[in-house]
Amino acid sequence: MSKISFKGDLKEGIKIIIDPNLNWDEIRNLIVDEIKSKEGFLKGSSIYVDFQGKDIKDEDWQEFRKEIYEKYGIMLSKELYRLRISNSNNAKIVLGPIRSGKSLNVKDNLLVIGDVNSGSEIICNKNVFVLGKVRGSIWAGYENNDKATIFALELEPEKIQIARYILDLSKIKKEKTGVGYWVYVENGEVKLNRYSGGKKNG
């Protein structure tokens, strides 16, 4: 196989597959070269990196993710594509960022592969999954569906709401552990937890 291969698919998302025989420096350089060559297309998106079982030090990975996001506005993940929307036939998938000033209204589940920029809004009656950073507003379960949930890699929102419940934004804390945030309603209150490897950390 080639040392690195890039694949993009609306159902499976955008991913980079890595030859596990490469060392970390080679992997870093190849990913950067791949992103540079497609920067215009990829900016504001999220990419799943498949290391095919190769063990990567978490501190190296987190430092690299931060570097890529700051330079190119691209969020890398090696965990998140374990998530699946249960009925893909009833899900809307948006590839690329939701830009400022845009309003997106969806009846079914929504998967956004990219950022939700400030000044934009998402209104969705079911679950919202954002493989990127939320800076705008999200209202899930707008028809009083308090079973709806929101997932995002990063949260710096203007507003988060599920059904009639609004998240207290002061609850959002930046942590090094976990790969994203779950937002859901429990006992009449919007709760927020970090997500890590298939479980929510309270």
Swiss-Prot record:
Keywords on record: Cell cycle, Cell division, Septation
Pfam families: MinC_C (PF03775), MinC_N (PF05209)
A GO biological process held by the record: regulation of cell division
SUPFAM superfamilies attached to this UniProt entry: Cell-division inhibitor MinC, C-terminal domain (SSF63848)
Family that this chain belongs to: Belongs to the MinC family.
UniProt function note: Cell division inhibitor that blocks the formation of polar Z ring septums. Rapidly oscillates between the poles of the cell to destabilize FtsZ filaments that have formed before they mature into polar Z rings. Prevents FtsZ polymerization.
Subunit comment: Interacts with MinD and FtsZ.
The name this protein goes by in its record: Probable septum site-determining protein MinC
Organism per entry: Dictyoglomus turgidum (strain DSM 6724 / Z-1310)
Gene that specifies this protein: minC
